[in-house]
Amino acid sequence: MENHLKKMPSPLLSLVPILVLVALLFVTIRTFGSDALSGGSQVVLLTTTAVASLLAMIFCKVKWRDIEEAICKNILGVATAIIILLLIGALSGSWMISGIVPTLIYYGMQIIHPSFFLASCCVICAVVSVMTGSSWTTIATIGIALMGIGEAQGFATGWVAGAIISGAYFGDKISPLSDTTVLASSVTHTPLFSHIRYMMLTTIPSMVITLIIFTIAGFTHTSNASGQIAEFAASLNESFNISLWLLIVPVVTGILIAKKVPSLITLFISTAMAGGLAIFFQPHLLQEVAGASVADASSLFKGLFMTFYGSTQIDTGNEALNSLVAARGMAGMMNTIWLIICAMCFGGSMTASGMLESLTSVFLRFMKRRVGMVASTVFSGLFLNIVTADQYISIILTGNMFKDIYKKKGYESRLLSRTTEDSVTVTSVLVPWNTCGMTQATILGVATLTYLPYCFFNLISPLMSITMAAIGFKIKQHHEEDQSIIVN
């Protein structure tokens, strides 16, 4: 009986919570800057949840119980993603303290040759970002070092910054440790590794084209900065016991991913293996983390668990290395988890009120073909990056807005999750007032509009997504009425 009393909100009324969200986010970003994710954005989401709920109860006759149930259902839907994020925090700490990431960086530095500096720069940042799951950490650490090397070799700052950002966001996009990757998959209800594998179809071609461009651009530069590279590598070697044996963990992790082992199991095994290697290869670092005078069993146990759950700082004598080996642990994931929960509250209120359905119905009228649907998703993601100034909010809104549309059109959720990352994750750094754009410009000392033309990976990815949609490669359409599968 209650369902008959509910009224479908008009698209205009449905826009009100979105407009309030954009306005409050604008003020929040201007006020808190890159610290907006530490609480400001979460408060904004809860505030707009209240606005959407009030409008639903007053104008649409929706009962609070229905809204509450929708919110709880949304939060329950991301419970696995939250556990994954906690494990990612533990894994990032264990990979750092065990020396896995430093070993990858150490050997990665050896491949730099002046003639191929830009391409090597992009590859190194990509590897580090894949292993850490953070473009911000990569740019703030190895990126700064590479900026110095690039400037010493006479490269324009825009080119070097473009190579660093292209590589860093390649890793941020496909790493199972990346919070944006986990967020995009959870919002669209796509299994994490299925999402990552499907992204490879657009990400790898985009990266290949990017590397070709950077390789050609680097041919004219032949100056040698081997001294600086050797100094950085030496600092890594002095702080960690660098060993190729440590690379067993990434190899095993890759095999587990290829075998489609569930994310939680893969992350747990990888974390446990890294923890064991940390005790064997880096006992001195575990002792330092524990603040103990002797590397006994108790201090090793304490140091290892502290890297799992808390923030870890290692004094290497090198400022860049200190930042690189600083792991956030599980505690470092709390802002993202908090954001996801608040976003699910907002999404639940928009769903229960019918506002999300009202907005998506407008989009549905104009999307008659697959290419138009994907292109609309891409441009919507870019638009949200511009107006919300935050990639996390943009991922959440894009996923929620188009989720039902893709389902009604019969397309797999992984197409939406891939398109969302192809548009939102990589373009956030290209917007000067976006938290990503502001942060990276500040860290690298290069204005956003200066490096924008050289972020080839970030510029190519959205276009590649649309191109793949036009070709129809590996895109399946399912029609519920006849249970048929059409491979486009």
Predicted regions and their residues:
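Hydrophobic transmembrane alpha-helices of multi-pass small-molecule transporters
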Residues: 1-85, 201-211, 218-342, 483-488
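Alpha-helical transmembrane segments and their immediate juxtamembrane interface regions
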Residues: 11-14, 18, 123-134, 244-252, ...
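Alpha-helical transmembrane segments in multi-pass membrane proteins
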Residues: 21, 44, 48, 52, ...
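Juxtamembrane membrane-interface segments at transmembrane alpha-helix termini
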Residues: 57-60, 150-157, 174-178, 277-288, ...
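Membrane-embedded alpha-helical segments and adjacent helix-loop junctions characteristic
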Residues: 60-151, 309-403
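Early transmembrane hairpin of solute transport permeases
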Residues: 80-167, 181, 201-207, 211-219, ...
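Hydrophobic transmembrane alpha-helices that form the pore/transport pathway of multi-pass ion
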Residues: 111-205, 380-422, 486-487
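Juxtamembrane and boundary regions of transmembrane helices in multi-pass small-molecule transporters
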Residues: 173-176, 181-234, 245, 394, ...
